[in-house]
């Protein structure tokens, strides 16, 4: 997906990972969807020319960061998007919370927006069942 995105939109995307996946299929799909929605939001709203995605795990945590050099995001813009029914960032947040993850929006001198998700590795021990599939 990332290679297709780079080729289609001409946005430089660097992807770094040590995450092997395969321990929890639903979690792996959730990570994919978070990255997919984030890249879609970056294309639609940020004007970024550069994106950096890092997905790494250690003994205790799996951490995903998605950073871009676009126009940035303020709390007011997030609240306005929610009121207008543009819920991309809230969909991402819900996916993170489904796996008891932490969610932060940050920025630094290089990147105007940094989405950070942090999950405890212990939550991967049990396969999350999507109740919507059953019903």
Where are these regions (language model features)?
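ATP phosphate-binding glycine-rich loop and adjacent ATP-lid/helix-beta elements
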Residues: 78-109
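Conserved short strand/loop->alpha-helix "switch" segment adjacent to the catalytic nucleotide/phosphoryl-transfer site
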Residues: 10-36
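Glycine-rich nucleotide-binding loop
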Residues: 61, 72, 109-116
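Acidic ATP/Mg2+-coordinating residue in the GHKL
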Residues: 68
């Amino acid at each position: 997906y990332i290679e297709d995105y780079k080729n289609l939109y001409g946005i430089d995307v660097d992807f770094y990972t040590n995450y092997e996946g395969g321990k929890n299929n639903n979690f792996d799909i959730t990570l994919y969807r978070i990255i997919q929605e984030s890249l879609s939001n970056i294309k639609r709203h940020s004007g970024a020319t550069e994106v950096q995605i890092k997905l790494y795990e250690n003994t205790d945590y799996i951490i995903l960061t998605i950073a871009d050099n676009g126009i940035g995001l303020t709390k007011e813009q997030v609240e306005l998007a929610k009121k207008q029914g543009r819920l991309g960032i809230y969909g991402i947040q819900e996916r993170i919370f489904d796996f008891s993850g932490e969610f932060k929006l940050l920025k630094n001198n290089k990147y105007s927006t940094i989405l950070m998700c942090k999950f405890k590795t212990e939550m991967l021990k049990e396969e999350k069942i999507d109740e919507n599939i059953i019903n």
